[in-house]
Structure formats: C-alpha cells, structure tokens
C-alpha cells in the first residue's frame, strides 16, 4: 500500500515520518521495518507502554534495534529521497488487516506493532529475542486499550485514561505513602454507608478549608487496603481524578469531553471495582463549557443517578453554595457529609499520630508538649484558619526551623571563624611593619590565633560528632518506618513467617538501637555543653506563631519580665500627672502577657476623658512605643471622619454590591494584618451614634464580621477611646479635692447623655484625666527640651537650659483649659525659633553649646 496521512492516527503517521527522517540520517536508500520499529520506540508513547506491559526492558530493546540498524549497508551521503522497502510495504498491509480485525477506522500504533511482530525481516526475530510473542503483544494491547475502538485520529489520549489523569490512592496506601488518619471515624463510616447504596451512592465531603476532607478519603483508602471495610468495598480501587491534567492541553472543541468520557467509561466498565474521588468537585461545574461545548457535570449526571459511577467529592462550604447548589440536578445526586473542625483535644491526637512521620522527614525529635502547644496556641491566636491544618503547619515549620539550625554552622563556631579572619587580616597588615610596638602586637595576635585555632578545631569536632549522632538517629527512624511497612505488607499477603521474622527480629533490633541512641543524646542534652538542639519544644512553636501573627506568645524571658514590671514607670516618665490612667493601662498589659486575660475579649478597653492637651493621645502613643518600639505602631481611627451614618461601612468595609466592597474596612483590615495592636479611637464623641453599634461586639466578644463576611479577631488588641465630654466640669472642679466626687458624677451624667448604657457597660474602665498643675508642666518642659536637645545633636550642637528659663517657660505656657499644648507652642515660639534663626545666620557652629537663660520677661540665648 502507498501510505497517506488520512489512513493513520496522528501518532502512527508521526512515527512513519520519523522513520523516514531516520533512514535519511542513517544514509539508507530504503525505508524498512527496523526504521519504523526504532521510530515507534523513540516516541516514548504507546509502543513503549505496550512493550513494558509484556515485561520488556524498553531501553535495552531500543539499543538492540539500533545495533541491528547500524549493521545495514549505507550510502556515502544522505539520499535526497527514500524508497519504501518491500518488508515495510507488507507490514503496512498487515497493519491494515489488523485495523479491520479490531473494527477500527484508522491504522494506530498497536496495529503497526502487531504487523512488525510478524515481520520476517527483523521484527519477529528481535521481539522473540526479547521474549515477546504475538499473543503476549495482543494481551498487552487489550490491557492498555480495553474494549475501545479507534474512531478518530487521536485515540491514544483515551487509552489508560485513569493512569494518565488519576492517582491510585489505594496503591499509595499500600506503599505507605499516605499519612496516618487519626479519628474521623464517624465521617468515614458515613462515607462508606453512602458508597454502599444501590443508587446515588456518591458522598460529597463539605467543610472549611483545612479541616481534613482529603484526609478522610485517604483514611478510606487505608481501610480498603487493610480490609477494614464492608463487602461492598472489599478490594476496590480508590482513584483521585486530576481535573487540571484532564483539562490541560485540550486544544480542540470536544477533546476535553472525549478524555472525560474515556475516564468515565473505564470506571463504569470496571463493574464497581473503581471508586472515583474528585477533589475540589466544584471545578467540574462549568469545566470545558466554552464556545458551546458541554459542561463536564452534565456528562457525570446520568451515571451518578443510575449508580454506575461511584464518586466521592470534596469541596468547601462557600464553593458548594456558589457552584453546586446552583445546579439542583447535580446537587441531588450527591449525599452531603459535613466535616466539622476537630476540637483541640482531637487535634492533639491527630498531631500525635503524625508526629513520627514529621520526625523522620525532618530528622529531629518533637516533644509532646510542643504538639499540645501547637494545637492550643493555633486555636487561640490563628483565627482565620482551621484545625488541624494550622496546627500541623506549625509543627512542620517549627521542625523545619530546627533542622535548618542543625545543618547551619553553630553561632559559637561562626564567631570564632570571624574572629580568626579578622586577626589574620591584622597579622598580614602588621607583617609589613618593622617597629617594636607592631612586632609585639604581631606576637600577641599569633598567640591568640593559636588559642582560637585550638578552640575552633575542638568545637568543629564536637559539632560534627553531634551532627553525626542526630543523622544516625534519623537514619534509624527511616529504617524502622521501612521495616514496619514491610511487616504490614507481609501480614496483608498472609506471609506470617516473614512478618514474624521482621517484627521480632529486625524491627526489635532497630528499636533497641534507636532507644540506646536516644538515651545517649538525652544524656548529652542534659549538659550545657551541647552545640545543637535536636528536639522541637513548645518555645519553638510559640516563636513560629509570633513570626506568623506578630503576637508575642513566647515564654517570657527574664529581660522581658523586667521590661513588663517596669512598664508603669516607663509610661510615667513620658505621661506626666495621670497616675490612675497609667496604672490601669500597665495592669491590663501585664495581665495579658502573664496569660491571665479573658481569651474571648480584647486585652483591655478604656475610655479616656478629660480636657484637651492633658495626655490622652500621648498615653496611647507611649504604650504603642513600649510594646512595639514605635509611636506609629498603633491603629489610629480619627472619629471626626465618621460623622455621617453611612461612614460605618468605612470601618468594617462596604457590603456586597457597593463600591469599595473589595477594599475592606479601615479598622478590620488593619487588625487582620496586625492582630496585636493598640487601637486608638480619637475624639469618639464626634462620631455618629450608629458607629458605636459596631463597637459593641468588639468590646464584648472581641470580634466583628467585616463587609466580606470574615470574622476579625480583636482579642489581642488594646482599645483606647478618647473624648472631651465633661471636660468643662473637670476644669471647674478638678482643683478642689473635696469636689472630686461631684466632678465624677457630673462627668458620668454627661457620658450617659451622649452614649447608650450598653456601650458604656462594655468598657473595662472610664478614666478621668485631671487638668495639669504648674509643677507637672515644669516636668513637661524638661521632656520637651530633651526632645529638642536630641534634634540639635544631629547638627552637632548641645543645649543647656537653666532652671529659671524652665520655670519661665512653664509659667507662660500654663493654661488649665488647654493643657500642655500652649506650652508646646511657647517652646516653639520662645526657644526653637530664636535657635533656628541663629543657625541660619551662622552664629552657631558645630560643637557649640547653646546656653538658655531667662531675664526681663524673655529668654536669652548665647
């Protein structure tokens, strides 16, 4: 026959074209069967898969075909054209007969292979040498293509579809590749129950991301392998479908549907032996439905309803609502299994089950206290994710962090290395000098280098020894895991002799060695001389949480304890004259960091009342500075911007359908990004009353739902509200101690008139800031002058202010109504401006001291 592209499938024709190019490259005049056989093998496609099924080593077989080809006579140069040889012509005729025998429309790869197996020139000889007969080849072809017929020019895409587009979870469970599944018995039992139904035997697992939906299916695969399932599921295959691979590369209309049909056909023809698992099943809805093509879910519906296809789906609550509930016909074919977040004790059990896997992977030990801390701390502090996923991630990252420390050079050795490098450079420099001082220094350096060299070598030896011991421990754990897998496989195959030999011989020996190695390491860890740690502790977990969220949950070290105990004194140094306010704020922070504050409420919520300029906002800034080392580290909401009713949406985000829905709220977004913060609501009385309705949940439950439906956690925030309400009463009665109760009563009446009782009742404390006395203003002068001095230091100038000048500034800046702000203006006017003019006029140069004194009702600067 004269071959044309229309007679062949795409891959078969590509092989013939490749064979022609191979003949030209080999300088052969005729195109023969060995060229075609080698071209088929080099395709790395169906021919190789079929031959592998017969037990042939394809690489070795390809080498033998190449050797046969090299023995053919060749021309001196590549021919312009290649002629079809008699053997190949006959082989193509036989391939045509095979096509008709299979009832196919096109000559495919398998027809060519069968034709070449009957080739007297070389094919029969080469294949029989490899142990392949026509019958074994036919069996392999049937195994690969099943009972499908070739009706288009790309049939290879539909062969072994499940192997190409799926992953066998039962095979993975058999090989020990899946993590153990702890708990979830109720959900697995319900899934098995639904799968055992006659029709609509399709469970869909619905739950939040990270609660363990895929793990339930993996648990089912492990139960199938262990035979721990009812008769209806015994020896079944559980295959997970990769929707991405199914869609990828489907260029033409109908190609995706063809692939999916091939997968579904394989599943249905297996007579219930295959259970399909589609993770993220909502991707099936609308998949492939572009330009008039059919939606993938419509291909599934008839099979799902009749019970021909047993399918497990998994999706989140939101995706199920958005995609699957919109298609009631698809929804009714699936039975819902709701998967809730496990409790903290359940999560601890799950972590204990996974512990060994993570220890083997990272080569470190994980303390049980670290697992408990991971479950409890992640539950409390990581509120936007779900257990057990977030707890597992914490353990994983903590172990990875410790492993990185083990493999990196210890700090002690690194410091010595740097010191040696520094001294070597100094030695090199001094070697060129001839004076006695340099020579003396050189001798000292050489002595120091000798000492450091000894330290370096002993520490390096110790490091390598400790590292080797840890690596040995890790290798033993890996070996134990491998032997345990062999024991399980032997028990499944009823090879009890081998199982007993492994379990009571090899495994027992390995476990004894492991115990000895662990005891040795524990003895070394007991001393303070070790360079490496090899156990993940709860402190490691706390440090990782602090990195993730910015919330300081690590165990308090001595320096931080002292810092917290001194917090009140530090705040007093910056906020003058407001003892009650400073004490209340410091107490709240100390309660929180000691772990005694209510986990379901903010750390503290205060309403600061008082006249303007007495330190309400300054105290908030001082607190932010002490906690986060920056005045700007607080979230400041100016309530004067929320005077209209509609501005509530700016705080928590616009509702769906409104402009700015995607942007989120100013308050909620700030807290989501920085959960540990000081939040200042400045001038609250200026805001619209409806704004306070939003704050009720924040103050009481430490949470609020933003415009996008996300719950934002405020339990690690300090809420400070400032207001000028009642400031007139404070000014009138503050000076007289006897009138203090009357003043508080009048302020409370003013508060009740402005704010609702449910709002006031939720605040931890309402603190009245007194108006400032003249003595306190004198201390504020010292603070302000100190700040000016630090600014002058940048210009290499010093500032000396006499006591008389300080008293004079306090006198002219004293105004009970306006607090400390007039003082600030007085310092700017009387002190900063003259100094600035003197600098600009060139009267002050670097290194000078600015002397400030007072006389004749003004300051004198020299």
Swiss-Prot record:
GO terms for molecular function: ATP binding; ATP hydrolysis activity. The keyword Cytoplasm applies. Residues 560-771 are annotated as: NBD2. Residues 84-147 are annotated as: Repeat 2. SMART domains: AAA (SM00382), ClpB_D2-small (SM01086). Residues 772-862 are annotated as: C-terminal. GO terms for cellular component: cytoplasm. ATP 2 binds at residues 610-617. Residues 392-526 form a coiled coil. It is found in: Cytoplasm. Residues 342-550 are annotated as: Linker. Keywords: ATP-binding, Chaperone, Coiled coil, Cytoplasm, Nucleotide-binding, Repeat, Stress response. The keyword Coiled coil applies. ATP 1 binds at residues 207-214. PANTHER family: ATP-DEPENDENT CLP PROTEASE, HEAT SHOCK PROTEIN 104. NCBIfam families: chaperone_ClpB. Homohexamer. The oligomerization is ATP-dependent. Part of a stress-induced multi-chaperone system, it is involved in the recovery of the cell from heat-induced damage, in cooperation with DnaK, DnaJ and GrpE. Acts before DnaK, in the processing of protein aggregates. Protein binding stimulates the ATPase activity; ATP hydrolysis unfolds the denatured protein aggregates, which probably helps expose new hydrophobic binding sites on the surface of ClpB-bound aggregates, contributing to the solubilization and refolding of denatured protein aggregates by DnaK. The Clp repeat (R) domain probably functions as a substrate-discriminating domain, recruiting aggregated proteins to the ClpB hexamer and/or stabilizing bound proteins. The NBD2 domain is responsible for oligomerization, whereas the NBD1 domain stabilizes the hexamer probably in an ATP-dependent manner. The movement of the coiled-coil domain is essential for ClpB ability to rescue proteins from an aggregated state, probably by pulling apart large aggregated proteins, which are bound between the coiled-coils motifs of adjacent ClpB subunits in the functional hexamer. This is Chaperone protein ClpB 1. It comes from Parasynechococcus marenigrum (strain WH8102).
């Amino acid at each position: 026959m004269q071959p044309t592209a229309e007679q062949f499938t795409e891959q078969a024709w590509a092989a013939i074209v490749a064979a022609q190019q191979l003949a030209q490259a080999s300088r052969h005049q005729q195109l023969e069967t060995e060229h075609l056989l080698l071209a088929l093998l080099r395709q790395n496609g169906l021919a190789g898969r079929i031959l592998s099924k017969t037990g042939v080593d394809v690489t070795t077989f390809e080498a033998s075909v190449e050797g046969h080809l090299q023995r053919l006579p060749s021309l001196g140069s590549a021919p312009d054209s290649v002629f079809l040889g008699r053997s190949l012509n006959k082989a193509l005729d036989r391939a045509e007969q095979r096509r008709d025998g299979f009832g196919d429309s096109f000559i495919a790869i398998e027809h060519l292979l069968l034709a070449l197996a009957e080739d007297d020139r070389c094919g029969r000889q080469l294949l029989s040498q490899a142990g392949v007969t026509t019958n074994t080849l036919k069996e392999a072809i049937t195994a690969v293509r099943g009972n499908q017929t070739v009706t288009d020019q790309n049939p290879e895409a539909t062969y072994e579809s499940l192997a190409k587009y799926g992953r066998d979870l039962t095979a993975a469970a058999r090989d020990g590749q899946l993590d153990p599944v702890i708990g979830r018995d109720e959900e697995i039992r319900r899934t098995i129950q639904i799968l055992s139904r006659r029709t609509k035997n399709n469970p869909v697992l619905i739950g939040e991301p990270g609660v363990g939906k895929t793990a339930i299916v993996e648990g089912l695969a492990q139960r199938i392998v262990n035979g721990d399932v009812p008769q209806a599921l015994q020896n079944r295959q559980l295959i997970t479908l990769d929707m991405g691979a199914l869609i990828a590369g489907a260029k033409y209309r109908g190609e995706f549907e063809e692939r999916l049909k091939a997968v579904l056909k394989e599943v249905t023809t297996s007579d219930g032996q295959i259970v399909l698992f589609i993770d993220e099943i909502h991707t099936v809805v609308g998949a492939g439905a572009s330009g008039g093509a059919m939606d993938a879910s419509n291909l599934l519906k008839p099979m799902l309803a009749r019970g021909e296809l047993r399918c497990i789906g998994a999706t989140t609550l939101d995706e199920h609502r958005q995609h699957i509930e919109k298609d009631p016909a698809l929804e009714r074919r699936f039975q819902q299994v709701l998967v809730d977040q496990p409790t903290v004790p359940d999560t601890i059990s799950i972590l204990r089950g996974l512990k060994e896997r993570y220890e083997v992977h990272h080569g470190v030990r994980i303390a049980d206290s670290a697992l408990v801390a991971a479950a409890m701390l992640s539950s409390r502090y990581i509120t936007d994710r779900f257990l057990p996923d977030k707890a597992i991630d914490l353990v994983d990252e903590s172990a990875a962090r410790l492993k990185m420390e083990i493999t990196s050079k210890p700090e002690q050795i690194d410091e010595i290395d740097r010191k040696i490098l520094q001294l070597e450079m100094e030695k090199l420099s001094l070697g060129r000098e001839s004076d006695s001082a340099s020579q003396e220094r050189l001798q000292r350096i050489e002595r120091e280098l000798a000492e450091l060299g000894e330290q370096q070598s002993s520490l390096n030896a110790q490091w390598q020894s400790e590292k080797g011991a840890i690596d040995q421990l890790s290798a033993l754990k890996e070996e134990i895991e491998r032997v345990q897998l062999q024991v399980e496989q032997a028990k499944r195959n009823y090879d009890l002799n081998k199982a007993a030999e492994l379990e009571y011989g090899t495994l027992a020996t390995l476990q004894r060695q492991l115990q000895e190695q662990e005891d040795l390491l524990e003895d070394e860890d007991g001393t303070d001389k070790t360079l490496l740690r090899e156990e993940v502790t709860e402190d490691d977990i706390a440090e990782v949480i602090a990195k993730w969220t910015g919330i300081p949950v690590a165990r308090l070290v001595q320096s931080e304890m002292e810092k917290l105990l001194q917090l009140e004194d530090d705040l007093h140094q910056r906020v003058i004259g407001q003892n009650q306010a400073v004490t209340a704020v410091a107490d709240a922070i100390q309660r929180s960091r000691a772990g005694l504050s209510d986990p379901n409420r903010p750390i503290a919520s205060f309403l600061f009342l008082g006249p303007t300029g007495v330190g309400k906002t300054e105290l908030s800034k001082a607190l932010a500075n002490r906690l986060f080392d920056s005045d700007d580290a607080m979230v400041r909401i100016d309530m004067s911007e929320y005077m209209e009713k509609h501005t509530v949406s700016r705080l928590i985000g616009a509702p769906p359908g409104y402009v700015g829905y995607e942007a989120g709220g100013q308050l909620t977004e700030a807290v989501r990004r920085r959960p540990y913060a000081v939040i200042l609501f400045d001038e609250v009385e200026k805001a619209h009353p409806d704004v306070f309705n939003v704050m009720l949940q924040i103050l009481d439950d430490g949470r609020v739902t933003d415009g996008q439906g996300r719950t934002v956690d405020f339990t690690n925030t300090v809420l400070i509200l400032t207001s000028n309400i009642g400031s007139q009463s404070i000014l009138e009665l503050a000076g007289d101690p006897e009138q203090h109760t009357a003043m508080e009563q009048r302020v409370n009446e003013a508060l009740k008139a402005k704010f609702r009782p449910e709002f006031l009742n939720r605040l931890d404390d309402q603190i009245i800031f007194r108006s400032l006395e003249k003595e306190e203003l004198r201390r504020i002068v010292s603070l302000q002058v100190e700040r000016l001095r630090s600014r002058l230091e940048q210009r290499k100038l010093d500032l000396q202010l006499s006591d008389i000048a300080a008293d004079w500034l306090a006198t002219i800046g004293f105004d009970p109504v306006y607090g400390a702000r007039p003082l600030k203006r007085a310092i700017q006017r009387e002190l900063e401006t003259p100094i600035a003019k003197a600098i600009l006029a060139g009267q002050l140069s670097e290194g000078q001291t600015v002397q400030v004194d007072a006389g004749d009702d003004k300051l004198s600067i020299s």
